[in-house]
C-alpha cells in the first residue's frame, strides 16, 4: 500500500476554505492508515500559527493524532545531505541565489527527500518547486487529493 505525506499547503488551504477542509477531511479519513506527518510540515504549521487558541487547536486536532499513532517522520542525515547537494546543483545550473531563496523552498527539499526515503507520495499543490527539486533527485508527488489504490 502506498504511503502519503501531506504538505503544509494542504492544511493551510483547509484552514481558509470550508470546501478545502471537507476535501482534506475526506482524504484523511480514507487514507488514515497510510498517512504520515513530517516534522518539517509540523514546524511550518506551528510557525504560521499566531494566536494561542489557534496553536492549541492545531496541536490537538491536526498534529496530536499523528504523534499518538507514531506516524511522524523526521529528516534524516541523508535528507540534510540532499538539501546541500540540491542547493549546490541549483546554484550551479539555475543560478539560484541562496540569500534570496525562501525558507519554504528549503523545507520543500527536506520534505521531498524524507518522502523519498519513506517511499511515500508527497501530496502538495506546489508542483513548481517540486519540479525544480526533481532535477536533482526523484520522488513521488501528487496534487491534492489522489485516489487511493
Residues of each region from the PLM?
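Short active-site oxyanion
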Residues: 1-2, 32-35, 69-71, 116-121
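Short, well-structured N-terminal submotif of metal-dependent ribonuclease cores
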Residues: 1-41, 47-65
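Acidic, PIN/NYN-like endoribonuclease modules and their adjacent C-terminal/linker elements
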Residues: 3, 112-149
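General small-molecule cofactor/ligand-binding pocket signal
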Residues: 36, 73, 140-142
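Phosphate- and divalent-cation-binding pockets in alpha/beta enzyme and binding domains
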Residues: 44, 82, 132-133
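Active-site neighborhoods of divalent-metal-dependent phosphate/nucleic-acid chemistry enzymes
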Residues: 71-121, 125
Amino acid at each position: 500500500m502506498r504511503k502519503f505525506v501531506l504538505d503544509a499547503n494542504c492544511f493551510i488551504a483547509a484552514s481558509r476554505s470550508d470546501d478545502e477542509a471537507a476535501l482534506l477531511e475526506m482524504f484523511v479519513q480514507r487514507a488514515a492508515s497510510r498517512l504520515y506527518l513530517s516534522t518539517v510540515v509540523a514546524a511550518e504549521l506551528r510557525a504560521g500559527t499566531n494566536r494561542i487558541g489557534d496553536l492549541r487547536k492545531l496541536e490537538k486536532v491536526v498534529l496530536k493524532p499523528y504523534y499518538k499513532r507514531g506516524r511522524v517522520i523526521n529528516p534524516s542525515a541523508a535528507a540534510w545531505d540532499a538539501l546541500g547537494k540540491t542547493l549546490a546543483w541549483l546554484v550551479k545550473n539555475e543560478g539560484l541565489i541562496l540569500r534570496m531563496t525562501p525558507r519554504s523552498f528549503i523545507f520543500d527539499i527536506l520534505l521531498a527527500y524524507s518522502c523519498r526515503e519513506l517511499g511515500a507520495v508527497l501530496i502538495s499543490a506546489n508542483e513548481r518547486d517540486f519540479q525544480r527539486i526533481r532535477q536533482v533527485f526523484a520522488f513521488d508527488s501528487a496534487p491534492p487529493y489522489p485516489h487511493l489504490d
